Amino acid sequence: MIVREWLFFTMAPCDAAEPWQLGFQDAATPMMQGIIDLHHDIFFFLILILVFVSWILVRALWHFHYKKNPIPQRIVHGTTIEIIRTIFPSIILMFIAIPSFALLYSMDEVVVDPAITIKAIGHQWYRSYEYSDYNSSDEQSLTFDSYTIPEDDPELGQSRLLEVDNRVVVPAKTHIRIIVTSADVLHSWAVPSSGVKCDAVPGRLNQTSILVQREGVYYGQCSEICGTNHAFMPIVVEAVSRKDYGSRVSNQLIPQTGEA
């Protein structure tokens, strides 16, 4: 039974922070997958450098001991080794820099014609969302507030201090534009599984794009210190199928907006 549970939690996607977690959450977007791949590539080069430098250090300590070489050699110049130690690190830096720059510039790209635009507004200390592509019967955009569920009132299976009363529902495999701003102080809209962290600045509109590739529930938090309850501003993005998303919009968001 224990082995079965271990296999389940090991193979299941990790879309929320876990106790003693050291690695990344599982990627839900191509952007996050690129970040993870870049991290692994850089880590590979770091291991090579660590092994090489450690080998040189151990070799120097072993061979150049004062008992073995009481009279040290005086070497003031070595053209070959100087060329190697200049060219070799430059090649490594090129292998690291080229994919990192490509990923960095792709983060700034915004989809020209997104299928859905969602506006996320930060408040002290909750969030409000606006689906500007849909209008209710009274010609109002679909809006709702999202508050954290108190830590003393979670339901079975909910994450402590990460669950909200109203989730952001998005369709999977669809280009989505997120417009981020703030109504009071600096906030941030960050969801690690999607590889997105966008600052919410009062009086300014920042935007980012996401393409969630699989259905699931993704958790995030405010990543900008914004006051006393900074830790109580979670973000929950629920990615569903396009068919389910359409029914959610018609059955939940529109009635909710009408009541507001």
Curated annotation (Swiss-Prot):
Transmembrane segments: 42-58, 83-104
InterPro entries: CcO_II, CcO_II-like_C, CcO_II_C, Copper_CuA, Cupredoxin, Cyt_c_oxidase_su2, Cyt_c_oxidase_su2_TM_dom, Cyt_c_oxidase_su2_TM_sf
Chemical reaction(s) catalysed: 4 Fe(II)-[cytochrome c] + O2 + 8 H(+)(in) = 4 Fe(III)-[cytochrome c] + 2 H2O + 4 H(+)(out)
Subcellular location: Mitochondrion inner membrane
Biological process (GO), any one: ATP synthesis coupled electron transport
The protein's Enzyme Commission number: 7.1.1.9
Cofactor note: Binds a dinuclear copper A center per subunit.
Membrane topology: Multi-pass membrane protein
Residues bound to Cu cation A1: 187, 222, 226, 233
Family: Belongs to the cytochrome c oxidase subunit 2 family.
Protein name per Swiss-Prot or TrEMBL: Cytochrome c oxidase subunit 2
Species of provenance: Beta vulgaris (Sugar beet)
